[in-house]
Amino acid sequence: LKKLDGAGAASIFKAAKAKGVLTFADMTADAYGIGPEGVAEIYPYTDYIMPSYEEAVYAAREEDPDAIADYFLERGVGTCVIKMGSRGCFVKNRSQRFMSEAFAVKAVDTTGCGDAFCGAFISAVLDGMGLEECVRYASAAGAINATVLGAHTAVKSDSQVRGFMEEALKNTEER
């Protein structure tokens, strides 16, 4: 969808920001060969960017999560959330910086875990949760997604995600 890359996406994000709409961007592999700067025009209009570690390394040409986050922040992104699979999630903005651990699950299929994370993260932000809570909630959704075969059959409800989080906390306290 070349019309949504570069200037096309930037015009959509710019219009959204002008109306006061929060903007979120998940990244994907560079299927069209547009290069790391191919979507850089959206960065000044992006409140939250949520690349996987591999996507972030490609875009920033850096390997250190801190340096990667700085790359996005220096270009105008509000908050950088780097999804790192079983290693957790690195988060940075102008006032916060933290690493959030992943939930330990027996992974059956990781297809769609990043999408589950992003959807849950957006939902949590729109529900007014704090940033660390948003990340934990999103991580829980991603972890639940990994426990079944398929990209979109595991995460069914907010109460399921919250129950998973409570159970994980209980198990951690028992150790």
What residue ranges belong to the model's regions?
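Ribokinase/PfkB-type carbohydrate-kinase core domain
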Residues: 1-48, 53-98, 160, 166-175
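Conserved post-catalytic alpha-helical subdomain immediately downstream of the catalytic base
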Residues: 71, 75, 79-84, 101-169
